[in-house]
């Protein structure tokens, strides 16, 4: 009974806050700015096909939903290519990866309309300046093969799983925490939103170690971990989009 009362009270408080003068306008203002579809560029594949990459940029401070339809459409051809419908704040590259056959003529435009403003991607898709190389090829080609991918629709790829402050060019190769201390794990699981209706999940587990590991919430990418004994542990964060799984392992030294 206490929990139920708390939830209802909290909801009523939010409703009351929304009813204050100017609050509704403030909430609307957080999502009333432009959302732009963006063309990242293309890759020439070895089998003669092309891989196209699309992104988006949102000036809003909260997520915006634009359902597939007149306001979220690819053309020519079918409107629905599996493109994103939820648009997070900021610039998000490689969000819709499309494989097209070698006879592609360069006409494949993504158009978004939000708050009365309509914007579209470039119509000059095959100019040499749009050809991706280096890190762009790696980012676009992650998790799929063009030869076996469906044509003319956004390809589902495994989620991107990372741990902030660990590995790579900027982070250490191991995390350290004193015995009895709590380790803050800043993980993230990012996905392009495919398959439609799928659920993106995260799960931490201990792979090895001299003791036990207790997570504050093992199903949250960002969580706290406690260790029962000193020594070296290996932890794993698994991210799933309900079809594909991706993992990253973290070495932790407890001393």
Where are these regions (language model features)?
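Extracellular acidic, Ser/Thr/Pro-rich low-complexity tracts
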Residues: 56-60, 189-195, 208, 241
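C-terminal edge beta-strand
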Residues: 246-254
């Amino acid at each position: 009974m206490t929990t139920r009362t708390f939830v209802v009270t909290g909801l009523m408080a939010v409703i009351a806050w929304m009813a204050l003068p100017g609050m509704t306008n403030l909430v609307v203002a957080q999502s009333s700015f432009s959302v732009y579809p963006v063309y990242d560029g293309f890759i020439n594949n070895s089998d003669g096909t092309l891989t196209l990459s699309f992104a988006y940029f949102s000036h809003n401070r909260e997520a915006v939903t634009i359902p597939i339809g007149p306001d979220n459409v690819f053309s020519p051809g079918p409107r629905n290519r599996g493109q994103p419908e939820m648009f997070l704040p900021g610039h998000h590259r490689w969000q819709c990866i499309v494989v097209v056959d070698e006879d592609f003529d360069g006409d494949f435009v993504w158009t978004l309309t939000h708050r009365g403003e309509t914007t579209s991607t470039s119509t000059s898709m095959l100019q040499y300046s749009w050809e991706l190389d280096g890190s762009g090829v790696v980012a676009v080609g992650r998790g799929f093969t063009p030869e076996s991918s469906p044509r003319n629709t956004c390809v589902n790829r495994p989620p991107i799983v990372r741990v902030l402050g660990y590995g790579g060019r900027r982070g250490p190769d191991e995390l350290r925490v004193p015995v009895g201390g709590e380790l803050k794990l800043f993980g993230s699981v990012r996905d392009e939103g495919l398959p439609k209706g799928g659920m993106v999940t995260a799960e931490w587990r201990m792979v090895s170690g001299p003791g036990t590991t207790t997570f504050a919430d093992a199903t949250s990418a960002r969580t706290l971990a406690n260790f029962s004994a000193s020594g070296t542990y290996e932890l794993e964060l698994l991210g799933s989009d309900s079809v594909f799984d991706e993992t990253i392992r973290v070495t932790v030294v407890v001393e």
